[in-house]
UniProtKB/Swiss-Prot annotation:
Quaternary assembly: Tetramer of two alpha and two beta subunits.
GO CC term (a single one): phenylalanine-tRNA ligase complex
Stated name of the protein: Phenylalanine--tRNA ligase beta subunit
Gene behind the chain: pheT
Record GO biological process: phenylalanyl-tRNA aminoacylation
InterPro entries (alphabetical): aa-tRNA-synth_II/BPL/LPL (IPR045864), B3/B4_tRNA-bd (IPR005146), DNA-bd_dom_put_sf (IPR009061), Phe-tRNA-ligase_IIc_bsu (IPR045060), Phe-tRNA-synth_IIc_bsu_arc_euk (IPR004531), Phe-tRNA_synthase-like_B3/B4 (IPR020825), Phe_tRNA_ligase_beta2_arc (IPR022918), PheRS_beta_core (IPR041616)
Lineage start: Bacteria, Pseudomonadati, Spirochaetota, Spirochaetia, Spirochaetales
Amino acid sequence: MPKLEIYKNLFLDKIGKNFTNLEISELLEPFKAEFDGFDESSGKIKIEFNDTNRPDLWSYLGLARQIKTYFFGEMPYYDFFSKKGDFKKFYGEILVDGKMSQIRPFIFGFLAKGLIINDKMLETLIQFQEKLCQNYGQKRRRIAMGMYNSNFIKFPISYIASSPNHKFVPFGMDYELSLLEINEKHPKGLEYSHIIKNFDKFPLLLDDNNNVVSYPPIINSNNIGSLKVGDTDLFVEVTGIDFEATLLALSIAACDFYDMGFEILPVKTVFREPFNLDFKELVCPYYFQEEVEFNVENINRLLGSNLTLERICLSLKKMGVNSYSKDFKNYIVPPFYRNDFLHEVDVIEDVMIGEGLSSFNPELPKAFAVGRLSPLEEFSRNVRNLMVGMGFQEMIYNYMGSKKDFIDRMNINDQNFLKVSNPMTENYEYIRASIIPNLLKSESVSSNFPYPHKIFEIGKVALKNLDTTEGTSTFTNLAFLMSGKEISFNEINSIVATLFYYLNIEINLIESKTTFYINGRGADIVIEGFNIGGFGEISPYVLNNFGIFIPCSVFEVNINKLMSRS
């Protein structure tokens, strides 16, 4: 969970009132944040958040904004946001190469002017950038932010798909390296190059003088890409693979810079062919959030309350959320810096927090029951202990993913996969039917760790099944992966034999026709005439799709079927 260290004097100055440490702790409670101490020598407060839904709070500016709104009724407003059909005047352009649509497609930016950066401000900006990129940005994979002295940049800026051999001086060095060399030698390249290394070309940001601004999301240019104390004019950009996440990160940054005292000047992004978007250009910061409908009866039913519409609107306003009624329906308008309202339940949560938890009377549960582990869970725990005992490390993955990872890279068809009809992003478009793609994706970013690699997961998978009422079936699977120069079919066969020996289950093996195995090096596992899974060596074609350059063998079985025949 995100942790902040903020200067107490800056924090209180921004709130406009003085508070003791105990009072600050109480101010933080509604926002799922905890006061974690005060260092008198540095003058810093330590704060830890208990969830990641509100990245707008991960700076003293965002926290102060929310506290002033909640406790003192000061609703912020920002007049520099463009909206659909109402673009603001822009002061620079970013031209996006069409080839970036398949690499890291989105980039948006703004200019910030009129304030001289001092030591504490610079430290605050760097911490904000780090928290946003590491947590909300999923260690720069989802989004990454860059900040520059705009006086050294000539607009328009070009965001291009560059040759890996393009050279520039990266931040922290005094000599040129190619993009490929940065991936292999620079500390930031070693840490983050896995995000883009599987592409033939890499992202590059150039100004109109053909000077390198940065190599996102890896490293800035040493000549342009460093902020210093005394700088006054800044260019801020965010790149990413998720349209809304990239826009939101930029919006949060713009609001924070404005609250710090900067003037915000919009910048236009122009997308060139073959981008398949509903728009060709966007002036940012841009308000993209959708209104969410809510129902008074639903709110009172879930909260066990009897709130009026007026009271609900006041509670929402304390959270910075405006609301209105039209045609006998009620809607909320998310703030510029928030996009965490995915469902009416999220609105209800804000009403609850705005109302204050202490205003709800505690009630004892009306039903009581004693739980126990299900037979499936007991069996799974036994299997888990065996895997750990054989030297495997357990992984935990998301059940949803992209067509690219689950289907295309695996060289299989999608006939058994469940597709989400209205996905928020194509990265979470399918529900997994196998754990193996998750294991391979982990392996693809683990080449810097000593071999052999031995990882496993016990988790849910879902498949189409037209014989059921729902049209789907959900199972618990066990899957593991072994990788290394010496890993072969014989190695994994030995592990499989050991596993089933300790489970006291007899199995039969038949040659597998699975397309992602090397021909002749895969086996299906059969018990009492039923196929429950298989194992084998992954084909070089599939390994290459994932950017893996060392032999891998995988295993996967259906634990439900396995347990029923044990």
